Swiss-Prot record:
Protein name, per record: UDP-3-O-acylglucosamine N-acyltransferase 2
Gene: lpxD2
Key word Cell inner membrane present: no
InterPro entries: Hexapep, Hexapep_transf_CS, LpxD, Trimer_LpxA-like_sf, UDP_GlcNAc_AcTrfase_non-rep
The protein's annotated pathway: Bacterial outer membrane biogenesis; LPS lipid A biosynthesis
Length: 343
């Protein structure tokens, strides 16, 4: 069962309510009024917990779980015990996410401004905002309604933040325009100068940065992620993007709508990502490239050339998945035969 030490769930909910929330179908209409009190892993569930099955490798656990209710894909219904109530959805992980949001809704703290917060007189703060201790709000800043600004967070001059945003503790934001429903986790740094300089034999010469950072609506930015401001243009993160912890976004980078960047991704300056691009953990991308719509780059790959829309690439340097697999098979064969690859 869930650990309620830190977050107590809402509910309980009846199955017909969860079906409506998630868009799932109650299998054979059974169990409409059965009550679910929490969410749990298959191996830890009690009879009133809800579990999920979305991968075949967990079928054995499903057969032995104590849970009476499971969110499940259509292809896995045949593996469920006869006594189990099923919420069937073509994307059970999405259905689980929607139900989890119902059990654990986002907290909306009441309006509050700490006496230790420093807010410049020209700043405009919306209604029902929560400004925590030690926060600094600069000149001509505009913060929308129902926002939360965490402890010791710095919001620099002329920054604009939309409605319903959560800016956690120890964040710094400069030279940025941020949309609605944005979450920025602790330690993130947004809007500092990028890594730009000219060099000769006598040293390095800084290129001043005059651009900003534009972040769309419904974006999440992970802890200790850094997003540099543009040099002459802006750095842009479009709507619905998800950036994990410890991601580095260089100056002038453009990230298309709905893209997902996993932990420790690094993107050098002026590279552009299309919509719904996925960069897995530790992917590195050099500057001035274009990665097309819907492309996927597998973990730890290093990208040195453009990637076409819809392509899936991996390796170092990144190539198509089929070519990467051929390279790996060739290396294994060469090692086993103790022969060096031909030049």
């Amino acid at each position: 069962m869930s650990n309620y030490q830190f977050t107590k769930p809402a509910g309980p909910f009846r199955l017909f309510e969860l079906a409506k929330i998630s868009g799932a179908t109650l299998y054979e209409g059974k169990g409409e009024t059965f009550t679910v009190s929490g969410l749990a892993k298959l191996s830890e569930a009690t009879s009133n917990d809800l579990v999920m099955l979305h991968q075949k490798k967990y079928v054995k656990e499903l057969k032995h779980t104590a849970a009476r209710v499971c969110i499940i894909g259509p292809d896995y219904v045949k593996y469920a015990p006869d006594s189990m109530y099923l919420l069937v959805h073509p994307n059970p992980y999405k259905a689980f996410a929607l139900i989890a949001q119902a059990f654990y809704p986002s907290e909306k703290p009441p309006g509050f401004i700490a006496t230790s917060a420093m807010i410049e007189s020209s700043a405009i703060i919306g209604v029902d905002c929560f400004i925590a201790h030690g926060a600094y709000i600069g000149n001509q800043v505009k913060i929308g309604n129902r926002c939360k600004i965490g402890v010791n967070t710095y919001i620099g001059d002329t920054v604009t933040i939309g409605d319903d945003c959560l800016i956690e503790d120890n964040v710094s934001i400069r030279h940025a325009v941020i949309g609605n429903n944005v979450v920025i986790y602790s330690g993130a740094r947004i809007g500092q100068d990028g890594f730009g300089f000219a060099s000769d034999a006598n040293g390095h010469y800084k290129i001043p940065h005059a651009g900003g950072v534009i972040i769309g609506n419904d974006v999440e930015i992970g802890a200790n992620t850094c997003i540099d401001r543009g040099s002459l243009d802006n750095t842009v993160i479009e709507d619905w993007c998800r950036l994990d912890n410890l991601v580095q976004i260089g100056h002038n980078v453009k990230i298309g709508k709905g893209s997902v960047l996993v932990a420790q991704v690094g993107i050098a300056g002026s590279t552009e990502l299309g919509e719904h691009v996925t960069l897995a953990g530790q992917v590195g991308v050099i500057g001035h490239l274009k990665i097309g719509k819907g492309a996927t780059v597998l973990a730890s790959a290093k990208v040195y050339k453009n990637v076409k829309s819809g392509d899936r690439v991996g390796g170092h340097p990144a190539v198509s998945i089929s070519d990467w697999q051929k390279q790996i098979r060739f290396l294994k064969t060469a090692i086993k035969s103790k022969k060096s690859p031909k030049s």
